[in-house]
A protein has these predicted regions:
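Mature N-terminal segment immediately following signal peptide/propeptide cleavage
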Residues: 54-73
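C-terminal motif of bacterial Sec signal peptides marking the signal peptidase cleavage site
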Residues: 14-16
């Protein structure tokens, strides 16, 4: 009986000392493949973000992916056979609720003109301007549109025209950078005063890629939300892709995505 009591005492002693091991008393989520704790500085400090899914960017709508018949579904009476119907699977994606309007593209031009205000970048500014002469055609009276459509406030919310594929692609890149820059400012990871000094920054302006690569030096402000921490549990003032805070790159939709959304599968 004394031996049993002695062994029980030893077991209780080990149980009581369990909390004294160099592992955190705080309950953590554990890895299903190793059993090690996530977000525990005493167990390697591997960080798992609480973010579960991507947030919706400004002006975007979520489109649930699926399968549809892409191409002509009616009889090809001309016999061209240049749009053969086929089943296509589309992954879920986000798309604008409406077309990019004149005012949105003028916002883009305004940023370029301020950021690249040195005369040496005149070609950069000119390359971004839309071709307003697309309204001109034989036997037409579209001169008022040539002069007013892009700039006049009455056409602010009309779709921008005269934009090439390259210009549209550059606009997407710019838009993604501006959205992510604002996210960092709102979280206190970039000082908002830097938004006031975009003039003349040129190649030194914020881009998502340069930020993630550590090439963009931003003066942080006080974090307004739950502070990010590093593997040692210390606060950090930079964001990684794994945090799930920044938006993915913006891009133009593929032909399949465009047709899928246009057919109303949203």
């Amino acid at each position: 009986m004394r031996n049993l009591l002695y062994l029980s005492s030893i077991a209780l002693l080990f149980s009581a000392c369990k909390g004294g091991l160099p592992f955190s008393k705080k309950k953590h989520e554990t890895s299903s493949v190793t059993g090690w704790n996530y977000n525990d500085k005493n167990m390697g400090g591997f960080q798992k973000s609480p973010v579960q899914e991507q947030s919706t960017g400004p002006g975007l709508v979520f489109v649930q992916g699926g399968t549809f018949t892409m191409g002509a579904s009616d009889e090809d009476v001309m016999g061209d056979w240049n749009n053969v119907p086929r089943r296509v699977t589309v992954s879920s994606f986000y798309i604008d609720k409406s077309e990019v309007a004149n005012i949105h593209y003028r916002e883009y031009l305004h940023w370029i003109e301020r950021t690249f205000d040195d005369p040496m970048y005149e070609a950069v500014i000119n390359a971004a301007k839309p071709d307003t002469l697309v309204w001109r055609s034989e036997l037409s009276a579209n001169e008022p549109l040539v002069e007013n459509y892009f700039r006049h406030p009455s056409y602010n919310n009309y779709p921008v025209v005269g934009v090439s594929w390259r210009q549209a692609n550059d606009f997407c890149i710019w838009r993604g950078n501006r959205v992510n820059e604002l996210i960092l400012v709102q979280r206190g990871l970039v000082n908002p005063n830097q938004l006031k000094t975009i003039q003349g920054q040129a190649e030194e302006n914020f881009t998502t890629k340069s930020y993630l690569l550590g090439l963009y030096s931003a003066q942080p402000a006080r974090q307004k939300k739950a502070a990010l921490v590093d593997e040692n549990g210390r606060p950090r003032n930079y964001v990684k892709i794994e945090d799930g805070i920044l938006m993915p790159d913006y891009r133009l939709p593929t032909e399949a995505e465009w047709e899928y959304a246009a057919l109303g599968y949203i």
